[in-house]
C-alpha cells in the first residue's frame, strides 16, 4: 500500500491543472476564535449561494463513450432555465484508473467538459466521488484509490472558481463505519488541502449520510470551509417501494405518503438544524427522491417531493434532487421535456 501511495503522489505531481483565471480560490484564514459573518465565513458563504440542485450523469454512457452520451451540454442550460442553480456531478472514477491509480486522460477530458459547460451555464458544481460501495466493502483497498483521485483532481482544478466544490465520498457505510471514516478523513482532508486550501469541501456522516450519524462526524475544528451533507430518503418504504436493489422495500407496493410521514420529515430536519447551529456548520441535503418505476402514483411522489423541498428550504438547507435522468426521473431525455409534476414540486415558481 505504501508503494501505491507513493506512486499516486507522483501521479498527482505530474497532473496538469486546467487553465482558469487566478481569481478563483484564494488562501483563506483558518482562525476560528469568533463566529464570522456569512460574508467572511467561506462555507456559510458557499451555502448561501446554493439553493436548488440536481444530481446528474452518474450512470450516463458519457463517461465511456462521449458519442453515446444521453446528457448533452445543452442540458446544463435547461437545468439553469428550469430554476436550478447547481449540479452534483456523480463520479465513479475507480474503473477509469490504471494499476497505478492514474486516471484515464480521456475520462479527465470528459470531466473538464462537464465542469466547463456547467460553469458556462451559470451553475455551481459539486464533484462527488461516488465509489461508495467499493469503499465501504473494502476500506483499506479504497483509501489509496480515493487519495489518488483527490490528488489528481485537486491538482487539476486547483485554479477552478470557488463555484466548484469537492465532495470527498458519497454515502460511506459499514464496514466503513464512523471511527474508520473519521480516521480516513484525517488523512484525506490534508491531501485535498495541499492543493485547494480555499476550496469548499462537502463531507457527510456514515450510514449512507444518515442524519442520525451527524453527532459522530469528526471534522477539523480549524477548517471552517466544509459544507456538511446528509441524504433524505425517509420514509424509505415509500420512496424505495419496488426498487430491486432495496431489499427491505423491493417487494412493497401501494405504500402511501402520510401526514405522519410529513411530520417525521419536519422533526428530522429540526434535528439537523439544531446540529448545524450547535456546531456552526452549514448543511446541504445532497440527495432525496422517490423511485419512479414502482407504479407509485405520480401525485403521491410529487407531494412527497414538495414536502421535502419545502421543509429543507424552511430550515435553510440547500438541496439536490436525485436525479435528472434515470429511475428517479426529473427530466425525460427521450421525450426532451421535464416531468412537470416533479419539477413543479421542486420549483413551484420559476426563479
Please place each PLM-identified region on the residue numbering.
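N-terminal export leaders
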Residues: 1-6
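Hydrophobic h-region of N-terminal signal peptides that target proteins for export
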Residues: 9-17
